[in-house]
Amino acid sequence: MKYGIVGYSGRMGQEIQKVFSEKGHELVLKVDVNGKEIKDSPDVIVDFSSADALPETVDLCRKYKSALVLGTTALKEEHFEMLRELSKEVPVVQSYNFSIGINVLKRFLSELSKVLSDWDVEIVEAHHRFKKDAPSGTAILLKNALGKEVPIHSLRIGGIPGDHVIVFGNVGETIEIKHRAISRTVFAIGALKAAEFLVGREPGFYSFEEIVFGGE
């Protein structure tokens, strides 16, 4: 598989390159703040950079007919409209979190929330000091899985890759569910799974959850 990375010089870009290369895939396109380096047409482009970079990423996908794996957070409706239009031409997958564990947790929470519908519930998320958006896209993803408005408490401290705690409370008892990303490698592994899934697929807007659960 030939692939490209938008945000190549960033922390996630470097992690993606490492994980993809270990599987024998060929990096043929690099994009970062210093410009572009293109060797060949990529089968898939992976972008974990910033929402501001999305228009250029979409243009590259159209130019090379590349599938898109998008892990950028803080997207607005205008960005989703761009993705919907692009998905008519190439396969696209977008997620605020490419951890397999988070996507399993998301499905679990949607069921648990039905059983504990009268319980209080809040979310606490912590990330490294350089993360710009708060609450995190993952916290919003988990809130949406709960199916109701819940308070989200955000911490930006140190070098934490990503902690998410969901606390359910009732009179006399609490349930705490925690997911911790130990390193950024988990997100790169998820991006690889998504990229390998998309190559050769028909155009469309795919979810990472359906990739994790085999199209259920």
UniProtKB/Swiss-Prot annotation:
Top-level EC class as recorded in UniProt: oxidoreductase
UniProt keyword list: Amino-acid biosynthesis, Cytoplasm, Diaminopimelate biosynthesis, Lysine biosynthesis, NAD, NADP, Oxidoreductase
A biological process from GO: diaminopimelate biosynthetic process
Lineage: Bacteria, Thermotogati, Thermotogota, Thermotogae, Thermotogales
Protein name, UniProt field: 4-hydroxy-tetrahydrodipicolinate reductase
Gene expressing this chain: dapB
Cited Gene3D superfamilies: NAD(P)-binding Rossmann-like Domain
GO annotations of cellular component type: cytosol
PROSITE patterns according to UniProt: DAPB (PS01298)
HAMAP family in the cross-refs: DapB
Compartmental location: Cytoplasm
Residues where (S)-2,3,4,5-tetrahydrodipicolinate binds: 128, 137-138
